[in-house]
């Protein structure tokens, strides 16, 4: 306790020096030779003492005054220290629903600089408010069963704010047509990775974002992590480790040695198809072996050579099995449309934080065959944006990037996501994780699921009936103290009645109450604030609703038309062949 606080705490007791001082003065001035005489004439003593309003500075009087004040202070201290601690009205819990006053410090006065959570609650986009105690990260956990309105009540209102760049998972492929026209009106660059209909997708080339050898290893890790077969062990065996070496060697070779046009997954697949190992002839060299032999002669310390040399330590039979595993893992790339999709890059992932951009990732919600491509993209996106913020913008992107990850469980596993979500806040990046139940997160991220949830300052529950989710939400809401009134009646030879009152603790909402919650209601929880039971956001009341296809079918966005228009625009970085025409002939 600092000196200033201690002084202020004891200051009131200095006032008691005066009455004790006057009491001592009255006793001293009272006529009488002994104690009984002075007590009998104490009235005369008070008359004499109070004739002057000033404190008596006679040493005995002053000492008694100070001693009296000290004794009184000690008595109050001891009484408070030994007093029983009562929490009247909150004996079993103090949980309650939040009010408008509770959320007010966390909302921006400008409606469009907020994230709409419910009809009455919003959270500001400002990462550094005037009062630091009101700072919250913008990571949001949204939980809602099928049909609870995750897209309508959360995704669409978020996009209509148009205050950030957005990367939005679109499981049904309906969000882009319904919101795209509005975003184009707001001068957004619109990107689309369509893994349902490849012909309606922009090109995505993972190799276009490799800047160093560590990026090669990150890409290989993400590729292997998201192309595991059903029931495959989470721990790697020696074959998977050998595959890792092989992919690293091939991608390293492509990145260092191939032309710009060849730096893509098609070249990687061609190299794998040209690879061969023979059980009966370990001296046999495939075309790929010859490529690496030539590279080793020229640069023996080359990154790709080192990786390939380790891979070739295996025997011929083992190498053949590894190559078969590589072919099986990359089997989806045998589809020509997917190969064409990854021929070159149009997504420009590293520029999302430079200017307002909306990237829609369209995934199938019934078939996860190509979802690994989205997981690759997200893994690269996080690393690219963090590096861009650190290397070019002093740690903070000029445009906030919001990732609205609808059906997050279908995306696949994003490498080190539990670590990324804890660090992206300072770079002006945030993630909204949208799930049908909290158990989905634990299925994919295992023990790291709790870390991910813990780094989301906001939780929005739209309804559901999955048991573990209901239990978690009920516990987070806490308990309130209620009054219990019991009435009893005993019948015998005489009838007697009894009344009793007691207090009990009750969950703010029990699991069964959560399960039958009104479909128009939702629960919003913000770290450090009481939870809110509110109406879901009414999309039709958003100021920009009239620009959506929901309001007017004429606003449907045509991505194919948009892509044709964008590809027709000449960019400063485009290259062309120049031919001279002889006009004299």
Describe the predicted segments one by one.
Residues 1-148, 152-155, 479, 490-491, ...:
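Basic- and hydrophobic-enriched, low-structure N-terminal and domain-boundary segments
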Residues 19-21, 25, 136-429, 444, ...:
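P-loop NTPase motor domains
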Residues 54, 97, 239, 255, ...:
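A residue-identity detector for tryptophan
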Residues 99-106, 119-132, 152-153, 318-324, ...:
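A broad, low-specificity signal for short, low-complexity segments enriched in glycine/proline
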Residues 105-106, 372, 408, 464:
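A short glycine-/small-residue-rich loop at the edge of a beta-strand within enzyme catalytic domains
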Residues 111, 115-117, 372-380, 473:
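Conserved long hydrophobic alpha-helices within structured protein cores
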Residues 421-523:
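Conserved ATP-driven motor cores of ASCE-family P-loop NTPases powering translocation/secretion/packaging/pilus
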């Amino acid at each position: 306790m600092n000196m200033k606080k201690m002084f202020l705490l004891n200051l009131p007791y200095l006032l008691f020096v005066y009455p004790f001082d006057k009491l001592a003065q009255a006793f001293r001035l009272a006529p009488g030779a002994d104690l009984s005489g002075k007590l009998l004439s104490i009235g005369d003593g008070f008359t004499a003492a109070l004739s002057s309003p000033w404190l008596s500075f006679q040493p005995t009087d002053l000492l008694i005054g100070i001693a009296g004040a000290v004794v009184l202070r000690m008595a109050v201290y001891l009484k408070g220290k030994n007093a029983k601690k009562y929490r009247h009205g909150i004996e079993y819990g103090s949980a309650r629903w939040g009010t408008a006053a509770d959320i007010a410090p966390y909302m921006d006065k400008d409606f469009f600089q907020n994230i709409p959570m419910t009809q009455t609650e919003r959270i500001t986009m400002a990462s550094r408010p005037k009062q630091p105690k009101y700072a919250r990260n913008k990571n949001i956990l949204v939980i809602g069963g099928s049909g609870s309105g995750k897209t309508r009540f959360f995704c669409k209102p978020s996009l209509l704010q148009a205050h950030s760049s957005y990367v939005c998972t679109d499981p049904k492929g309906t969000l882009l047509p319904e919101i795209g026209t509005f975003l184009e009106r707001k001068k957004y660059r619109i990107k689309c990775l369509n893994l349902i209909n490849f012909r309606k997708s922009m090109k995505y080339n993972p190799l276009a974002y490799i800047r160093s050898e560590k990026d090669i290893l990150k890409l290989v890790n993400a590729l292997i992590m998201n192309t595991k077969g059903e029931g495959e062990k989470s721990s790697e065996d020696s074959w998977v480790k050998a595959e890792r070496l092989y992919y690293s060697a091939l991608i390293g070779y492509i990145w260092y040695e191939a032309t710009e046009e060849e730096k893509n997954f098609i070249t990687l697949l061609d190299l794998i198809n040209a690879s061969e190992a023979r059980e009966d002839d370990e001296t046999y060299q495939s075309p790929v072996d010859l490529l690496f032999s030539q590279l080793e002669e020229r640069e023996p310390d080359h990154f790709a050579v080192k990786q390939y040399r380790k891979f070739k330590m295996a025997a011929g039979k083992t190498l053949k099995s590894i190559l078969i595993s590589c072919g099986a893992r990359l089997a989806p790339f045998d589809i020509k449309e997917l190969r064409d999709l990854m021929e070159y890059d149009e997504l420009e992932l590293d520029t999302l934080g430079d200017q307002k951009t909306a990237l829609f990732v369209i995934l199938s919600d019934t078939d996860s065959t190509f979802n690994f491509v989205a997981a690759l993209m997200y893994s690269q996106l996080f690393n690219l944006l963090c590096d861009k913020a650190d290397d070019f913008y002093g740690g903070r992107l000029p445009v906030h990037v919001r990732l609205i990850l609808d059906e997050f469980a279908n995306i696949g596993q994003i490498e080190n996501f539990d670590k990324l979500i804890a660090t992206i806040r300072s770079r002006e990046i945030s993630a909204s994780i949208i799930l049908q139940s909290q158990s989905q997160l634990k299925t994919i991220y295992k023990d790291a699921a709790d870390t991910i949830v813990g780094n989301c300052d906001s939780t929005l529950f739209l309804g559901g009936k999955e048991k573990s989710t209901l239990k978690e939400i009920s516990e987070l809401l806490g308990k309130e103290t209620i009054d219990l009134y019991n009435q009893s009646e005993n019948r015998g030879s005489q009838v007697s009645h009894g009344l009793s009152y007691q207090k009990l603790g009750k969950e703010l909402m029990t699991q069964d109450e959560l399960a039958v919650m009104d479909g128009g209601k939702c629960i919003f929880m913000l770290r450090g604030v009481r939870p809110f039971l509110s109406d879901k956001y009414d999309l039709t009341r958003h100021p920009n609703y009239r620009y959506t296809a929901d309001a007017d079918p004429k606003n449907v966005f045509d991505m194919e038309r948009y892509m044709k228009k964008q590809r027709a625009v000449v960019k400063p970085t485009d290259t062309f062949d120049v031919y001279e025409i002889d006009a004299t002939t």
